Amino acid sequence: MSRYYTKKDRRINIEFRPSTKATAHGGQMAINAVAGEFGLWERVRSEPRLDPRRHKGKGFEPVVYVTALLFSFTSGGDSLADAERLEDDESLKMLLGVKKLPDQSAIGEWLRNVGEEGAEALREIIHDFCGWALNKADRGRLLLGGELEWFFDDTQIEVNGKKFEGSAINYNGDLALSWQTLWAGPFMCDAVLGTPADHKFAPESCAHGKDVSAWMPEMLERCAPLGKGFTSHLYADSASSAGHYLECIEEGFKHFTVSYNKWVGPLETQAAELPEMAWS
């Protein structure tokens, strides 16, 4: 690619109108403003791990790829094809200060070329944004009972096809991807997509895709700085109730709630032996 594309700042005049006359681009401009206040565009430009180009004066700057993905996701998109469709929105490109947006093939190639180092750079930027936003938010709207709520969960995304990279037969017998996520307040501050067996420290059960909390300890360690200055409470489901996970949780949280609906057979047998007065 011989041409060079970047993102420029645009001077925008804000006008408040009734909802019957609101523009569809209003929310996108708000996203652009928040990203600018955080310093996202400068951060992306200064991150060498996000720029795999050999010739820096040619092609799309990394900030253009990030722009395409960010405004696709925040406009309801869920695929690289959706990001490509933004190229047809001339008014949006003008407002964002981009002359051209990459197609899905170019975005996919960029994601592959930045590799694990680039993914780590994006993760660091996301962590910093979450910390920045948490500290700017009104505490009354952010906290519940004076606590910042955290949530760890694994979502099983069922897939089908001859080959689906990263998928495995899960505990329910379905071919699925494991999407392990960690939330701090309203922000998803960390996530890993793929079979739990991908984790180098995963226990043996991960070989069968059954341990769906394998990434939790690493996520909690990476995101621990986000809880500074807050009283935090972590919620997790029964998949995180194994002893080594509880120890990890106790190290980072004074308050936590972990549901326990596995391996209850022995407990139910013991409970049945207790007299009725024990439950009154």
Where are these regions (language model features)?
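Dynamic "connector" segments at or just before major functional cores
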Residues: 1-206, 212-228, 252
